[in-house]
Amino acid sequence: MAILVGIIKQHVRNYMPEVFGLVTDLWDNVALQLPLVTLVEALGTALDAEFRPFLPTILPPLLKVFDGPQIEKNEKRTQTQMKVFDAFLTFGANIEEYLHLVIPVIVKTYEWPEGATALRKKAIQTIDGLSRRVNFSDHASRIIHPLVRVLESSNNEVRMAVLDTLCSLVIQLGSDFAIFVPTINKVHGVAR
């Protein structure tokens, strides 16, 4: 169905209530969550700004993918979570008014030290990508302090993703980023 949406693009708008009804009906089937997230991502791409009214319907199930015990390292669940991060990037500026719901999920994922490296890196890269589409000025502290903690304790691959994301946040926040520099310098000095 995601391929079909990719072909017909914005012409799917007339069928959105039915499509979202189908998505919500099938969501509890864990085996279908990855294809459903792919479908939602395709809808977000096809409709762009017209997708915004549907976000309140689809965000709760997407965020629910991150609920439950974090200890559970299930490959299928990790793939679905990574696809949800891709969907967040696809939603772009449409997601801005829901950042108060989305950011805690992303932060919790990249802060989790036992999490899969690929998933943690994807969460950090999601913040990086969103920083080019949405205004994080009201959420800077909630994002940057956990990033600094991750910078302090992670493997090199995750640390490099954190540094890239911090650079993107410097560009977006400009002089407002200055308040975080002493904290970063303190951690950077310890990491050397």
Where are these regions (language model features)?
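Karyopherin-beta/Importin-beta family HEAT-repeat alpha-solenoid scaffold
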Residues: 1-192
